[in-house]
């Protein structure tokens, strides 16, 4: 008698295998990622918990959505990342890097205002930054040319690392609350909650 194979059974098997394959990168990331064992408080003197007034005391000029180092504050002028000074471009035709460091703030309609992210550039390629961070923090999650490291307290570091050489390297420090949005955008919520290695509860 010819054996009858149920289509429903086959479909469930395919779904189970697909889920296992989808979870593998996330589980590998969590089990071999040193970053998830540490907290990330901010970038150097710029801590995520600083108030708007404290950011101004550091010498940053703050507007509606950002704070920048337009006046070259002495306390921030000599900051380095991976041994390289923060990149300032004084070329009047290329002002995208002029501020060096940009602190992005939460909306004014949501007081008290807090830091969402800290963006800066250094005189390295994106690939060099990514390799250095991998040595320090282990594997990363890669999405749309960005490499991400997520920390125990929910904060994250991302560096732009496309296939073509990108210089100067762009790096972003994400505050915990904002990093949650990034993580959910990279990995679907149901996928994260289904992983025993890393869940949204950790954030």
Predicted regions and their residues:
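Bacterial N-terminal signal peptides that target proteins for export
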Residues: 3-16
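Serine/threonine-rich, low-complexity intrinsically disordered segments
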Residues: 6-7, 19-20, 173, 198
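Short linear motifs in intrinsically disordered/low-complexity regions
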Residues: 9-11, 50, 90-91, 95-96, ...
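Residues at beta-strand starts and edge strands
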Residues: 13-15, 99, 114-116
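Bacterial N-terminal signal peptides
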Residues: 15-25
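Sec/Tat signal peptide C-region and signal peptidase I cleavage site
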Residues: 26-30
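Non-cytosolic coordination micro-motifs
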Residues: 31-82, 111-203
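Compositionally biased P/S/T/G-rich terminal and signal peptide-adjacent segments
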Residues: 76-109
């Amino acid at each position: 008698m010819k054996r009858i194979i149920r289509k429903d059974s086959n479909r469930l098997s395919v779904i189970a295998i697909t889920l296992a394959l989808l979870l593998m990168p996330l589980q590998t990331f969590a089990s071999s990622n040193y970053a998830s064992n540490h907290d990330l408080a901010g970038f150097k003197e710029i801590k995520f918990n600083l108030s708007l007034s404290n950011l101004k005391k550091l010498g940053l000029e703050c507007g509606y959505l950002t704070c920048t180092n337009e006046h070259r504050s002495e306390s921030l002028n000599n900051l380095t990342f991976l041994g390289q000074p923060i990149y300032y471009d004084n070329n009047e035709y290329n002002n995208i890097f002029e501020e060096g460091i940009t602190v992005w703030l939460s909306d004014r309609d949501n007081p008290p205002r807090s830091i969402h992210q800290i963006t800066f550039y250094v005189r390295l390629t994106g690939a060099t930054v990514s390799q250095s961070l991998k040595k320090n923090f282990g594997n990363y999650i890669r999405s749309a040319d960005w490499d991400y490291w997520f920390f125990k307290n929910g904060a994250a570091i991302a560096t732009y690392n496309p296939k073509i050489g990108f210089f100067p390297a762009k790096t972003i420090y994400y505050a915990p609350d904002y990093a949650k949005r990034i993580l959910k955008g990279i990995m679907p919520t149901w996928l994260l909650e289904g992983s025993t290695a890393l869940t949204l509860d950790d954030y």
